[in-house]
Amino acid sequence: MAPEVLPKPRMRGLLARRLRNHMAVAFVLSLGVAALYKFRVADRRKKAYADFYRNYDVMKDFEEMRKAGIFQSVK
């Protein structure tokens, strides 16, 4: 029984092949993370700001601050 000879690894272009594969995976992962961030964080934050400013009354807030004595120039 003769020992089996392992085939030689293909070394030519090894770095280019690995970089191509890893770049494709990195690109897909970055798109996934960007989409996840947009839908989980950015859209919720945008909606929260819109809800806040929809009901925000500037004059009411100003009067509360004036009554609390925050402004020195407005009595």
Curated annotation (Swiss-Prot):
Transmembrane segments: 14-54
Mitochondrial intermembrane face residues: 55-75
The entry's keywords: Membrane, Mitochondrion, Mitochondrion inner membrane, Transmembrane, Transmembrane helix
Example GO biological process: oxidative phosphorylation
Membrane topology: Single-pass membrane protein
Keyword DNA repair: no
InterPro entries listed in its UniProt record: Cytochrome_c_oxidase_VIc (IPR051389), Cytochrome_c_oxidase_VIc/VIIs (IPR034884), Cytochrome_c_oxidase_VIc_sf (IPR037169)
Pathway where it operates: Energy metabolism; oxidative phosphorylation
GO cellular component, one term: mitochondrial inner membrane
Mitochondrial matrix side: 1-13
Localization (cell): Mitochondrion inner membrane
Gene3D superfamilies per the UniProt record, alphabetical: Mitochondrial cytochrome c oxidase subunit VIc/VIIs
Entry function: Component of the cytochrome c oxidase, the last enzyme in the mitochondrial electron transport chain which drives oxidative phosphorylation. The respiratory chain contains 3 multisubunit complexes succinate dehydrogenase (complex II, CII), ubiquinol-cytochrome c oxidoreductase (cytochrome b-c1 complex, complex III, CIII) and cytochrome c oxidase (complex IV, CIV), that cooperate to transfer electrons derived from NADH and succinate to molecular oxygen, creating an electrochemical gradient over the inner membrane that drives transmembrane transport and the ATP synthase.
Family: Belongs to the cytochrome c oxidase subunit 6c family.
The protein's assembly and partners: Component of the cytochrome c oxidase (complex IV, CIV), a multisubunit enzyme composed of 14 subunits. The complex is composed of a catalytic core of 3 subunits MT-CO1, MT-CO2 and MT-CO3, encoded in the mitochondrial DNA, and 11 supernumerary subunits COX4I, COX5A, COX5B, COX6A, COX6B, COX6C, COX7A, COX7B, COX7C, COX8 and NDUFA4, which are encoded in the nuclear genome.
Name of the protein described by the UniProt record: Cytochrome c oxidase subunit 6C
Species whose genome carries this gene: Pongo pygmaeus (Bornean orangutan)
